[in-house]
């Protein structure tokens, strides 16, 4: 045989079926302004008027100067051109997007592109969900488990679990029929149907021939306390001829009889039963499917009168007889009552929604808003739906009667009423897990036509089939959540995400029209599930007000005046700004930046002189912006210099503006992704108890002893820098006391300076003429920014301040600084009274010394002998400026914590003296958006000019989570405050830094969409964070006390040492020739103290014991549940069990004789790093003492 050649068959991966298309750019210097998902490819990229526009195979992305539009393509309902230069984009969730172009030709070109991208798919594979899943298959196994997890066991085995949970008697009363196996009876019904046990499959076939679309009456819910059931079906086909079906009539009445035979827990005691126990027992023991009229059935309690709830009006029901439909006649259905609810059909709901979308797209403050909203009748339709559901719930709960619900076809209004009634009755469906089961069973399994109603079914051009039925039902659930905020485990963000992905086609959950189509197309295996994103373990969707264990039946107020417009969906512009937004100039060339800066939008607020009437300007609906064209700003535009003043939140209606550097416009708070502002009264209330971090955020580094002297000369202000670091978390009261200490105003407690030699307090004075010393302001726990009442209602005009290079500043050498041009910046506007000051400036890359000083008096001034850190990747940097890798899951689980959690603390980075080219920092984003186990770098407020503002201060990780400050090794806030004169702020001349390639913004979810904000849930997360922080702090204190007790126990000398024992020591001392002091003197007693005994580390003799796998059902850190796709990982240091997102870092552990890097959890990783840093610090602190003594 010859040599083996290449294989004849090529191995084709699933992603090869979905190759990316070539990117078409209108300008070569444009860059994609967002992070693409797996399988997502940008096809068109160009520029509109004052915006960047991009179209991928998943979304439409428009990046304006002060906002970002990020809409999945399947969310777009219609696209049209208006006024020749404007694209009018209407979305299926009622949003309307308008995009202006400079020329008519460009507008028509983008109209054509967008129309082709949003057209109905020709085949199912044209939907992005298939490409997304196929490209995710090429990832590593660990990534697949995190990102491609299918629905949990509660979804896959939902029917069996539901029957057991609701207590159906499947032996004597009910049975599960398999007549619909392989969907041979009804393709829009599940394969297993629950019917009374004496109903045969032959009778079910006869009933199916009489009901529309063969949707027969089946039971879907049973009340545990009284046994009353809820059934659903479609309309009977009576037609004008008045047809009847005996099997259908018998099946309906049999449901009521079965409910009487299977009473609930409350009725089992005899409250609802009038028959004898013997007869009941005889019927239970001798019951057979052929005994349809046994004596036991007749002798038991008379069945309750069944309520047939027709969702239509009586007129509509009778009119349907012309098309072959109709309604039940009470004469033909004995012991039944028919009631009509008068709910509108899909055509009326579609028109109402279109009117609602038109009203919501009007100007922000129309004079006829309430009347226009009333004319849409959207709230009226919600009210009717809620009344129908309340009627069903009251009939089942209070009267103990079974209910049969249907409309025309049984897949639109019927699931709305049934699912809503089940939420009212059963608290299980108000949990995250139960709500998922409810959507899967009542909407997906029973054939709601998601493909037609949402408009993504292939080859279906009938627009009359579209209707936001599921969106309307989610809106009604939102109304219940508003009225009962403590009885739902999920929050509003959960519902908003569900609305988005009902139309996005990113997940395959809502594709196709019925379960038969999904199974034939193998959708469940070829697409991801939306429940992977909306999983029960995701804390972002957890309602912190939820009270578990409550079995209250909900009785909502259904009046229109009690309902609210769902602003988070229909009016997102009025909601707090979303995260993940960045300045558009980051993705443009310098030439384009200057052009965009000069051509600002004309629909902004008119410019005034220094915004003197800012309060009245904030009352208007137009956003507030500032440009250098203001006459009062041009005079000082050349003198603006940066400092490190953190952000401050402004009152409602005002926007804090922050300059982004050379040639770029100011950035609003919403653009940086800051949390929404609160009124001053709430700020004062929330600032009483600031949260402090408790974990370390540092990498491996070296301490260098460096002598640095720095001074600044100016005529206006005295700038002080306050830096705090801690190695161990101190006592909370002492921690607060130390936080209030600032350069002469107080002195930190002695124990913090003596125990670890890590915590230090220092100030760097500058000779700027005058002094204005402010203590460290209290931290606002909601926004993470300090409150500065001393700076309220004043205008700040920075001026120049040149560093003194002769004193050894950390700036670049004068020769280098003179070669770089001086950038121009814009001033910030004056803040209104009642808000904190906002300062516009550039960052100082090297002018401020980022030092950690040694222990010395707090009031001492002058040159300091500081210590820098040396990171192997970044070079020299201060201790608190080292970066820490964090995982995506940590951000998504605690995305809005305002407290100083280590998961969100980006560490600042500075560059030492002499380095002309700064090292590039790590990027926090990647080209392909990945789930929790992908590491990212949290970018903190670094000292790096323009790029520092874009990459650090504006990064979503820092601005939204770390809130503009960093955490040192001990978890204490390492902030740098500038106490400035009320009139001016001085700073040094900045050095120009090289700007690396732009990094896309970091989104908080795996779906690539921003996370909806909620101020109340934000605050509740802070409260939970503070509670966990206190618990962790108490645990550390207990461990520390235990270690001290162990050391005392091991190192304690004998109570009464024998004389010969002391003589041995004395002789030993004499033999060594030591005549300095007598061992029998008073000082000799110190030699026998515990200080003379070397402490023994218990870890050297102990082996870490691992927690067994079977004992760990949840992650020790994030508390997520383990299952097939969420594997267990043991930390080699502590032995606890974690998920992949909480245990992915590797370090050697010499104490455990593990000298190669092994897997450790995030907490142990930080603890080991801090321990090593302490050892290095203690070694370097001892070197000067040894040198002096020699």
Curated annotation (Swiss-Prot):
SMART domains, per the entry: FYVE
Coiled coil: 1020-1052
Residue numbers bearing the Phosphoserine modification: 8, 610, 629
Membrane-protein topology: Peripheral membrane protein
Leading EC class: hydrolase
UniProt catalytic activity: a 1,2-diacyl-sn-glycero-3-phospho-(1D-myo-inositol-3-phosphate) + H2O = a 1,2-diacyl-sn-glycero-3-phospho-(1D-myo-inositol) + phosphate; a 1,2-diacyl-sn-glycero-3-phospho-(1D-myo-inositol-3,5-bisphosphate) + H2O = a 1,2-diacyl-sn-glycero-3-phospho-(1D-myo-inositol-5-phosphate) + phosphate; 1,2-dioctanoyl-sn-glycero-3-phospho-(1-D-myo-inositol-3-phosphate) + H2O = 1,2-dioctanoyl-sn-glycero-3-phospho-(1D-myo-inositol) + phosphate; 1,2-dioctanoyl-sn-glycero-3-phospho-(1D-myo-inositol-3,5-bisphosphate) + H2O = 1,2-dioctanoyl-sn-glycero-3-phospho-(1D-myo-inositol-5-phosphate) + phosphate
PANTHER family documented for this protein: MYOTUBULARIN-RELATED, MYOTUBULARIN-RELATED PROTEIN 4
Name of the protein in its database record: Phosphatidylinositol-3,5-bisphosphate 3-phosphatase MTMR4
Species this protein is from: Mus musculus (Mouse)
Taxonomic placement: Eukaryota, Metazoa, Chordata, Craniata, Vertebrata
Gene: Mtmr4
């Amino acid at each position: 045989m010859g040599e083996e050649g290449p294989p004849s068959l090529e191995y084709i991966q699933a992603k090869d079926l979905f190759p990316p298309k070539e990117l078409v750019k209108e300008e070569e210097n444009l860059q994609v302004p967002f992070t693409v998902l797996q399988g997502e490819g940008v096809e068109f990229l160009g520029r509109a008027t004052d915006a960047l526009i991009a179209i991928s195979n998943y979304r439409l992305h428009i990046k304006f100067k002060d906002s970002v539009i990020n809409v999945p393509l399947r969310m777009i309902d219609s696209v049209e051109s208006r006024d020749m230069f404007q694209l009018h984009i209407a979305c299926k969730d009622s949003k309307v997007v308008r995009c202006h172009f400079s020329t008519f030709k460009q507008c028509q070109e983008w109209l054509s592109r967008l129309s082709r991208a949003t057209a109905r798919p020709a085949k199912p594979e044209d939907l992005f969900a298939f490409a997304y899943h196929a490209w995710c298959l090429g990832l590593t196994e660990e990534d697949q488990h995190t990102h491609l997890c299918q629905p949990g066991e509660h979804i896959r085995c939902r029917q069996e679990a539901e029957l057991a949970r609701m207590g159906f008697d499947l032996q004597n009363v009910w049975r599960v029929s398999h007549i619909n196996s392989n969907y041979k009876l009804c393709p829009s019904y599940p394969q297993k149907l629950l019917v009374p046990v004496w109903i045969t499959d032959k009778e079910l076939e006869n009933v199916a021939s009489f009901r529309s679309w063969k949707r027969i009456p089946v039971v879907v819910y049973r009340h545990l306390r009284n046994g009353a059931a809820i059934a659903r079906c479609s309309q009977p086909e009576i037609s004008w001829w008045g047809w009847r079906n005996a099997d259908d009539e018998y099946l309906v009445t049999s449901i009521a009889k079965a409910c009487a035979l299977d009473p609930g827990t409350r009725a089992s005691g005899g409250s609802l039963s009038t028959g004898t126990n013997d007869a009941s027992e005889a019927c239970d023991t001798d019951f057979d499917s052929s005994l349809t009229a046994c004596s036991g059935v007749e002798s038991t309690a008379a069945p309750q009168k069944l309520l047939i709830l027709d969702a239509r009006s009586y007129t509509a029901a009778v009119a349907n007889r012309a098309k072959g439909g109709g309604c039940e006649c009470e004469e033909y259905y004995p012991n039944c009552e028919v009631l009509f609810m008068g709910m509108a059909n899909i055509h009326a709901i579609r028109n109402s929604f279109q009117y609602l979308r038109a009203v919501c797209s009007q100007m922000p403050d129309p004079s006829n808003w309430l009347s226009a909203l009333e004319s849409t009748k959207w709230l009226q339709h919600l009210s009717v739906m809620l009344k129908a559901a309340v009627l069903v719930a009251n009939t089942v709960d209070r009267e103990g009667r079974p209910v049969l619900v249907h409309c025309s076809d049984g897949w639109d209004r019927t699931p709305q009423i049934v699912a809503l009634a089940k939420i009212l009755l059963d608290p299980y469906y108000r949990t995250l897990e139960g709500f998922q089961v409810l959507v899967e069973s009542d909407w997906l399994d029973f054939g709601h036509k998601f493909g037609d109603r949402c408009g993504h079914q292939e080859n279906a051009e009938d627009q009359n089939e579209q209707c936001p039925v599921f969106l309307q039902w989610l809106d009604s659930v939102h109304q219940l959540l508003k009225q009962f905020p403590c009885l739902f485990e999920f929050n509003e963000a959960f519902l908003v995400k569900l609305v988005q992905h009902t139309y996005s086609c990113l997940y395959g959950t809502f594709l196709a029209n019925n379960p038969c189509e999904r199974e034939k197309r193998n959708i469940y295996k070829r697409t991801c599930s939306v429940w992977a994103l909306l999983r029960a373990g995701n804390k972002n969707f957890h309602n912190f007000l939820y009270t578990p264990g409550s079995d209250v039946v909900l009785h909502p107020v259904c009046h229109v005046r009690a309902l609210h417009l769902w602003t988070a969906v229909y009016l997102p512009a009025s909601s707090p700004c979303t995260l993940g937004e960045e300045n558009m100039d980051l993705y443009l060339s310098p030439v384009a930046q200057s052009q965009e800066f000069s051509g600002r939008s004309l629909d902004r607020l008119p410019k005034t002189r220094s915004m003197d009437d800012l309060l009245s300007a904030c009352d208007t609906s137009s956003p507030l912006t500032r440009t250098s064209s203001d006459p009062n700003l041009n005079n000082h535009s050349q003198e603006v210099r940066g400092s490190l003043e953190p952000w401050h939140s402004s009152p409602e209606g005002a926007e804090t503006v922050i300059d982004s550097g050379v040639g770029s416009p100011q950035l609003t708070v919403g653009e940086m992704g800051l949390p929404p502002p609160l009124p001053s009264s709430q700020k004062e209330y929330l600032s009483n108890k600031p949260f402090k971090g408790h974990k370390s955020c540092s990498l491996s580094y070296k301490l260098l002893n460096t002598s640095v002297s720095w001074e600044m000369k100016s005529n206006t202000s005295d700038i002080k820098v306050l830096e705090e670091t801690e190695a161990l978390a101190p006592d909370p009261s002492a921690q607060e006391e130390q936080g209030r200490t600032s350069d002469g105003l107080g002195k930190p407690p002695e124990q913090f300076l003596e125990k670890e030699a890590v915590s230090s307090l220092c100030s760097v004075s500058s000779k700027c003429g005058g002094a204005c010393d402010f203590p460290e302001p209290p931290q606002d726990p909601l926004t993470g920014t300090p409150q500065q009442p001393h700076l309220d209602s004043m205008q700040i005009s920075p001026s120049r301040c040149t560093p003194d290079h002769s004193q050894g500043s950390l700036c670049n050498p004068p020769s280098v600084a003179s070669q770089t041009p001086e950038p121009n910046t814009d001033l910030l506007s004056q803040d209104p009274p009642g808000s904190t000051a906002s300062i516009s400036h550039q960052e100082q890359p090297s002018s401020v010394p980022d030092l950690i000083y040694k222990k010395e008096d707090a009031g001492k001034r002058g040159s300091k002998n500081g210590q820098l850190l040396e990171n192997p990747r970044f070079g020299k940097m201060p201790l608190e400026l080292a970066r820490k890798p964090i995982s995506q899951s940590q951000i998504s689980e605690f995305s809005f914590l305002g407290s100083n959690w280590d998961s969100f603390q980006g560490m600042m980075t500075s560059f030492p003296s002499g380095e002309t080219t700064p090292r590039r920092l790590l990027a926090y984003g990647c080209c392909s958006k990945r789930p929790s186990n992908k590491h990212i770098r949290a970018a903190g407020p670094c000292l790096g000019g323009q790029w520092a503002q874009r990459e650090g201060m504006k990064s979503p990780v820092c601005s939204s989570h770390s809130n503009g400050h960093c955490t040192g090794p001990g978890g204490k806030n390492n902030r740098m405050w500038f106490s400035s004169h009320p009139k001016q702020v001085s700073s040094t001349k900045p050095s120009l830094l090289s700007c690396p390639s732009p990094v896309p913004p970091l989104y908080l979810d795996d779906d690539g969409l921003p996370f909806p904000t909620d101020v109340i849930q934000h605050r509740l997360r802070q409260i939970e964070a503070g509670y966990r922080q206190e618990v962790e702090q108490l645990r550390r204190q207990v461990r520390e006390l235990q270690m001290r007790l162990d050391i005392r126990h091991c190192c304690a000398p004998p109570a009464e040492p024998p004389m010969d024992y002391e003589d041995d020591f004395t002789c030993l001392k004499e033999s060594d020739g030591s005549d300095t002091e007598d061992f029998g003197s008073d000082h000799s007693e110190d030699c026998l103290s515990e200080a003379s005994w070397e402490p023994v580390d218990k870890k050297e003799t102990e082996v870490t014991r691992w927690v067994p796998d079977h004992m760990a059902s949840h992650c020790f850190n994030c508390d997520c549940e383990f299952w097939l796709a969420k594997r267990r990982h043991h930390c080699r240091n502590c032995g606890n069990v974690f998920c992949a997102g909480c245990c992915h870092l590797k370090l050697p552990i010499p104490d455990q004789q593990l000298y190669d890097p092994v897997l450790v959890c995030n907490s142990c990783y930080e603890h080991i790093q801090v321990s090593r840093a302490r050892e290095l610090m203690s070694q370097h602190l001892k070197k000067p003492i040894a040198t002096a003594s020699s």
